[in-house]
C-alpha cells in the first residue's frame, strides 16, 4: 500500500449495546491501518454501555465518545459523529457489528487505486451470540442510483466515503433506513458506489433489530422510495418488486 496514511473517521452510533460494543471496539483497535479515530455517539443507553465506553475512551486517545442528552435515533447520532469527524475518509460501523483486521487498509487501497468517492465491501453474517453463519453477502462491482433503488445490497458496516470528493455528509433525520437514503442521495448526485467483493466485515443478526424484521424493513424501504426519493407510485412499485426479489436472493 502507498506510504500515504490518511485519517479515517469511524462513525458508530450506540444504544444499549452492552453485550456487543466491546467486540465492535476491539475490531477497530485491531485494524492494520492505525490512522483512525472512532467517534461513538451514545443515544442514552440504560444498560451499562456508557460505563464500558468511558473505559475505552481512557484506554486509547483515538476513541472519542459523545453522550446525547435525549434518545434521538441513529440518524441524529451518526450526524453528530459526522460533524465531529476530522478524517478525509469516513467509515460506518454499528455498535453490534465487527470488521476484519485489514478492512480499512484494503478498502483504502481499493479506493485510492480507483480514485473513487464511495465504496462498499462484501460481508458475512453472524448469529446474535457471535456464532459465524455460513452466509456471505457479495458486493457487486458497482452500483448507480437506478441500481441501488432496485437492490439495497450496500451494508452500512462496509461503506467508506471520501469527503474530499463528496463534500460533507448528513443523514436524513428518519428513525430507520437513513443509511439507504444517504447512499441514494450520493448516487443521485452522480457518484458511483464501487464494490469490493471481499468479506471484510461481520453483521450481527440481532433479534429485535429492524433489519431482522423483514416486514418492517420492507415498509421503511417503501417509505424511502415515496417520501424521501419522491418516486412516482408506479416507479416506486416497480423498484419495490425488484428490491423484494433481490432481498430474497440475498438470503438464499
From Swiss-Prot:
Keyword entries, A-Z: Cell wall biogenesis/degradation, Glycosyltransferase, Stress response, Transferase
Residues spanning the signal sequence: none
One of the Pfam families matching this protein, by short name: Glycos_transf_2
UniProt-listed Enzyme Commission number(s): 2.4.-.-
Top-level taxon in the UniProt lineage: Bacteria
Biological pathway: Cell wall biogenesis; teichuronic acid biosynthesis
Induction: By phosphate starvation, via the PhoP/PhoR two-component regulatory system.
Listed GO MF terms: glycosyltransferase activity; hexosyltransferase activity
Record InterPro entries: Glyco_trans_2-like (IPR001173), Nucleotide-diphossugar_trans (IPR029044)
SUPFAM superfamilies per record: Nucleotide-diphospho-sugar transferases
GO terms (BP aspect): cell wall organization; teichuronic acid biosynthetic process
NCBIfam families recorded: TeichurnBiosyTuaG
Family: Belongs to the glycosyltransferase 2 family.
Extra remark: The nature of the anionic polymer present in the cell wall of B.subtilis depends on phosphate availability. Under phosphate-replete growth conditions teichoic acids are present, whereas under phosphate-depleted conditions, at least part of the wall teichoic acid is replaced with teichuronic acid, a non-phosphate containing anionic polymer. The synthesis of teichuronic acid is accompanied by degradation of teichoic acid and reutilization of liberated phosphate for other cellular processes such as nucleic acid synthesis.
Protein name (Swiss-Prot/TrEMBL): Putative teichuronic acid biosynthesis glycosyltransferase TuaG
Phylogenetic lineage: Bacteria, Bacillati, Bacillota, Bacilli, Bacillales
Amino acid at each position: 500500500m502507498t506510504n500515504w496514511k490518511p485519517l479515517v473517521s469511524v462513525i458508530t452510533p450506540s444504544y444499549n449495546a452492552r453485550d456487543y460494543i466491546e467486540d465492535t471496539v476491539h475490531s477497530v483497535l485491531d485494524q492494520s491501518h492505525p490512522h483512525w479515530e472512532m467517534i461513538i455517539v451514545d443515544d442514552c443507553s440504560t444498560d451499562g454501555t456508557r460505563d464500558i465506553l468511558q473505559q475505552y475512551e481512557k484506554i486509547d486517545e483515538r476513541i472519542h465518545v459523545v453522550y446525547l442528552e435525549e434518545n434521538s435515533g441513529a440518524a441524529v447520532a451518526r450526524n453528530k459523529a459526522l460533524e465531529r469527524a476530522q478524517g478525509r475518509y469516513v467509515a460506518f460501523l454499528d455498535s453490534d457489528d465487527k470488521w476484519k483486521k485489514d478492512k480499512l487498509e484494503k478498502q483504502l487501497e481499493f479506493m485510492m487505486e480507483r480514485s473513487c468517492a464511495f465504496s462498499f465491501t462484501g460481508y458475512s453474517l453472524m448469529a446474535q451470540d457471535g456464532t459465524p453463519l455460513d452466509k456471505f453477502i457479495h458486493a457487486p462491482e458497482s452500483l448507480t442510483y437506478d441500481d441501488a433503488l432496485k437492490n439495497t445490497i450496500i451494508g452500512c458496516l462496509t461503506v467508506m466515503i471520501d469527503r474530499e470528493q463528496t463534500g460533507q455528509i448528513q443523514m436524513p433525520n428518519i428513525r430507520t433506513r437513513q443509511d439507504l437514503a444517504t447512499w441514494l442521495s450520493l448516487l443521485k448526485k452522480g457518484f458511483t458506489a464501487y464494490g469490493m467483493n471481499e468479506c471484510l466485515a461481520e453483521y450481527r443478526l440481532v433479534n429485535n433489530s429492524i433489519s431482522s424484521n423483514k416486514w418492517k424493513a420492507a415498509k421503511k424501504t417503501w417509505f424511502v422510495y415515496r417520501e424521501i426519493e419522491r418516486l412516482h407510485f408506479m416507479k416506486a412499485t416497480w423498484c419495490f418488486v425488484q428490491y423484494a426479489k433481490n432481498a430474497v436472493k440475498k438470503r438464499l
